[in-house]
Every structure is written in structure tokens, then in C-alpha cells.
Amino acid sequence: SKELLEGFRRQGFAVVSVNYRLFPKCKCPDYIDDAAMAVAWTFENIEKFGGNKEQIYVSGHSAGGYLTLMVALAKEYMAKYGQDADKIAKAYPISGQTVTHYTIREERGLPDGIPVIDEYAPMTHAGRGGAPMILISGDRDLEMLARYEENAHLQALLQNFKHDSVLYEMQGFNHGTVLSPAVALISADIKKLWKQYQKQ
């Protein structure tokens, strides 16, 4: 999202903006592979641009939030490109689906609105460790159907497995307008973590 890109750039962060193939020109898991390949590329190349591979943070909104979760929790996708998803400093999915994405259900000809939880659902991979994360959702009364509730379910699973995670519900913000407060929240958290890293 351009709002994420510009929001983080204004905070002084080096930002790698990622595109991925879209259905119907491709099918699952091509777009998950694209996201994992991009994060792996960042680990391999960010130091050439003055970045620090120990300080790589991953975020995305909506479908990008789903891909953020899959890259961080389903570690086999990063491993395919020779990188360890556990090396991600922190993940910040914004309003991401935590069940199998509705695009995948559409590919299978399944009806809209009925959740599927299989290997393409981020919550399936809870309990396997992974990067610390902040789950961010819009207001449960303004978000897309069950989006807050899905994130709350994932957070409950992560907490059960002692995963370093927290869920923020941005009250008064819908699926689209959640981006502005999300950028502020994420930026503040990264700056705090950067200060801690520098003291090590």
C-alpha cells in the first residue's frame, strides 16, 4: 500500500515495497512464494543499501497482512529461499485474514463467507514459533466481516503457545482508515526496538 510505503519513509525507515502476482493470473501458493522471496531478497541484499539484516520488519495491509502472517508463521516458504523466518525482527500484519484467504476459497469455487482453515490459514501455523508480532485490526464494528474476530482467535492461539504477540483494535477506524494509526503504532514500536538494539 502506498500509504504504508510513504508513512514509513517519512519516519526515516528504509522501505522495500513488494508486489506479488494476483489471481487469476496465478494461483495459491504463488503469491505467498512471491512474498517470501521478496523478504528473503531483503535479508540477502539490505546491507548493500545501508540497512541492517538484524533489523528487518515485515508489514502489510489486508491481503498484505495475510501474506505477512504466512511469511512469518509458515516458515517453509522462507526456507525455500534459504532464509529463516525466525530472523524477522518483528511482524506487523494489519487487518489480515487469519483463516485461509477468501481469494483461495474463490479459486476453489467455494462460497463466500464460509471460513476454511487448512495449510493456507495463518492460524494453522500458530505454535511453531516465529517472529514476535503485533496484530492490528480496525474496529470490530467497522471492519470487514469477522476480521477483528479472526485476529482475536489467532491471538488466543499464539498466547496459548507463549508466542510474543499482542492484538490492537483501532477503535473508530474501518478496514481502509486503519492504515494511518497503524503506521503511527508500528513506527513507534520499531523506534523503541531500534534503541534497544543499539544498546546491545
Question: PLM features: residue spans?
Answer:
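Primarily recognizes the serine-hydrolase "nucleophile elbow" in alpha/beta-hydrolase
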Residues: 37-107, 118, 122
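Short beta-to-alpha linker loops that shape the active-site pocket of alpha/beta-hydrolase fold enzymes
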Residues: 14, 19-23, 97, 171-173
